[in-house]
Amino acid sequence: MGHYSHSDIEEAVKSAKKEGLKDYLYQEPHGKKRSHKKSHRTHKKSRSHKKSYCSHKKSRSHKKSFCSHKKSRSHKKSYCSHKKSRSHKKSYRSHKKSRSYKKSYRSYKKSRSYKKSCRSYKKSRSYKKSYCSHKKKSRSYKKSCRTHKKSYRSHKKYYKKPHHHCDDYKRHDDYDSKKEYWKDGNCWVVKKKYK
């Protein structure tokens, strides 16, 4: 005889009563305790299975949450590092720009100072040239003045001496009123006699 459940036996008894088997006594099988134990075991197993399943699900969900948490953390880290790298790139670019600007500004200042020094040097050279030419001109002018003065003095000396004798006839002195004139070159020379 195979194993039947309690509900199957009850249905069999009911059908026997309907058919006329009134003296049939329903007897529960002797293996009730064992079946109860088995059911208890299966119930325990199912409970443990449920627990293990729940714990498995929990562990899986925990793993998932942990992985997602790790992913989110790694994403945050990567995002932060990306932001940092972008900011670093920006700062590096700005630093490079500032360095290039400083270099260009220095070169511009140098070129301006060089231009100024070149202009001042040119001015000083032109000033020196003008000063030298002025000195040369002044020297030549002084020399010409000296030569002119010398020639003028020599001319005065040459011209004054006979002219002085020519003007003596105008003066009233102790000479005789008789005067003799003769031409000596370009000037009239007066010959006077005493009284």
From Swiss-Prot:
Q: Where is the composition biased (Basic and acidic residues)?
A: 1-22
In this chain, the stretch annotated as Disordered covers 1-163
Q: Where are the sequence repeats?
A: 36-48, 49-61, 62-74, 75-87, 88-100, 101-113, 114-126, 127-140, 141-154
BP terms from Gene Ontology: sporulation resulting in formation of a cellular spore
Q: Where is the composition biased (Basic residues)?
A: 31-163
- Organism's domain of life? Bacteria
Stretches the record annotates as 9 X 13 AA approximate tandem repeats of [HY]-K-K-S-[HYFC]-[RC]-[TS]-[HY]-K-K-S-R-S: 36-154
Keywords, A to Z, come to: Repeat, Sporulation
Question: Looking at the keywords, is 4Fe-4S present?
Answer: no
Q: Which NCBIfam families match?
A: CotG_ExsB_Nterm, spore_coat_G
State whether it acts alone or in a complex, and with which partners, per the record.
Homodimer.
Q: What does this protein do?
A: May be a morphogenetic protein that is required for the incorporation of protein CotB into the spore coat.
Q: What is this protein called?
A: Spore coat protein G
Native organism is Bacillus subtilis (strain 168)
